[in-house]
UniProtKB/Swiss-Prot annotation:
Transmembrane segments: none annotated. The lineage of its organism: Bacteria, Pseudomonadati, Pseudomonadota, Betaproteobacteria, Burkholderiales. GO terms for cellular component: cytosol. The gene is pyrB. It catalyses: carbamoyl phosphate + L-aspartate = N-carbamoyl-L-aspartate + phosphate + H(+). Catalyzes the condensation of carbamoyl phosphate and aspartate to form carbamoyl aspartate and inorganic phosphate, the committed step in the de novo pyrimidine nucleotide biosynthesis pathway. It comes from Paracidovorax citrulli (strain AAC00-1). This is Aspartate carbamoyltransferase catalytic subunit.
C-alpha cells in the first residue's frame, strides 16, 4: 500500500516510486547516490550490462519531447538488462483522445513493471502512481514546472563527486527559475543534503515570489549571485513556457545574466559550472565557459545514466 505521508514510500519507508525529491529522507537520497557510484564503472566495461532488471519491462512514456532524458533512461534500463518500450505518443491512442489513466491501464495490461513518465501537467506521475498495480513502479522524468527528480539527483551526484561534501558549499542557481522544474528539484536536493547556502539568481520576472519558504537566498544580479560560489548551475530560458514580455531580448538577457569567463572569476577559483541542457550558447552561457576547464556539463550526462540505473534498481527491488 502507498504511504499516506509520502506516496513515494511503502509502509516500511522504502522507495517504490520516484516522484519528487521533496519529502524524501536524506538517507534515501544518499542511498541513491551511493548506489549510483557503484554503477558508474559499468560505463567502462567491455560488456556494459548488469542483470538486475532482467525479465522486467520498462515503458518510457514521454508526453513531452526530450531526446536527452529519454535516451539516458533507455540506456540505463538496457544496462540493467530490462526490456524497454519507447511509446510514440504522437501516434498513440493518447493523441486520439484516450485519457491518461486509460492509456496507463492498457499498458499495464501488457505486463509493464515500471513506467518512466514525462508530462506537461504537474502531478501527472502522482496520478499514475495512485492507479497502478502494487508491483508497478513510476519514475517522474519531469512534470510541468513541478519536479525533475532524476535531474536533481544527478546534479547532486555531480556536486558530491567534485566537492565531496555539501556542508560548506555555496551553490548558485542562475536563470529562468520561474519555469524550471530542475531548479525546484535541485533546491530540494541541496537543502536535504545540508547545503548551507543556496542562491537563486535571475531577473525579477523569472524568479518566483514564494521561494523564501524553501530556504534560499534570492539575488537579482549575477555578480551578487555567483560571488564566492562553489557551484554555479545555469538554466536555459524556457521560451516555450513563457507568456507575455518577460524579457526584453536574448541579447539583453545575456548582457545581464549570461555567464562569461570574466564573470565566472567572481566565483571561487575552483568553482564548477553545471547545466541540465539543452544549452543555449550566447544566451545564458558563453561558449568559452561551456568548453572551459570549470564546466562539468558532459560528466553530468555520464553520471545521469548511473543515477537513473540506481533509481530504477532501487524502486524495482521494493514492494508496495
Amino acid at each position: 500500500m502507498l504511504s499516506k505521508r509520502n506516496p513515494q514510500l511503502n509502509r516500511n519507508g522504502e522507495l517504490i516510486h520516484l516522484l519528487s525529491i521533496e519529502g524524501l529522507p536524506r538517507s534515501i537520497v544518499t542511498h541513491i547516490l551511493d548506489t549510483a557510484a557503484n554503477f558508474v564503472s559499468v560505463n567502462d566495461r567491455e560488456v556494459k550490462k548488469v542483470p538486475l532488471l532482467r525479465g522486467k519491462s520498462v515503458f518510457n512514456l514521454f508526453f513531452e519531447n526530450s531526446t536527452r532524458t529519454r535516451t539516458t533512461f533507455e540506456i540505463a534500463a538496457k544496462r540493467l538488462s530490462a526490456d524497454v518500450l519507447n511509446l510514440d505518443i504522437a501516434r498513440s491512442s493518447a493523441s486520439k483522445g484516450e485519457s491518461l489513466l486509460d492509456t496507463i491501464a492498457n499498458l499495464s495490461a501488457m505486463a509493464a513493471d515500471l513506467f518512466v513518465v514525462r508530462h506537461s501537467e504537474s502531478g501527472a506521475p502522482y496520478l499514475i502512481a495512485q492507479h497502478v498495480a502494487p508491483h508497478v513502479h513510476v519514475i517522474n522524468a519531469g512534470d510541468g514546472r513541478h519536479a525533475h527528480p532524476t535531474q536533481g539527483l544527478l546534479d547532486m551526484y555531480t556536486i558530491r563527486h567534485y566537492k565531496k561534501d555539501f556542508s560548506n558549499l555555496t551553490v548558485a542557481i542562475v536563470g529562468d527559475v520561474l519555469h524550471s522544474r530542475v531548479a525546484r528539484s535541485d533546491i530540494h536536493g541541496l537543502t536535504t543534503l545540508g547545503c548551507p547556502e543556496v542562491r537563486v539568481v535571475g531577473p525579477r520576472t523569472l524568479v518566483p515570489g514564494d521561494l523564501s519558504h524553501m530556504g534560499v537566498r534570492v539575488c537579482h544580479t549575477l555578480e551578487e549571485g555567483i560571488r564566492d560560489a562553489d557551484v554555479v548551475i545555469m538554466l536555459r530560458l524556457q521560451n516555450e513556457r513563457m507568456s507575455g514580455a518577460l524579457l526584453p531580448s536574448s541579447q539583453e538577457y545575456f548582457k545581464s545574466f549570461g555567464l562569461t569567463p570574466e564573470k565566472l572569476r567572481l566565483a571561487k577559483p575552483d568553482a564548477i559550472v553545471m547545466h541540465p541542457g539543452p544549452i543555449n550558447r550566447g544566451v545564458e552561457i558563453d561558449s568559452a565557459v561551456v568548453d572551459g576547464p570549470q564546466a562539468v556539463i558532459l560528466p553530468q550526462v555520464t553520471f545521469g545514466i548511473a543515477v537513473r540505473m540506481a533509481v530504477m534498481s532501487i524502486v524495482a527491488g521494493n514492494e508496495a
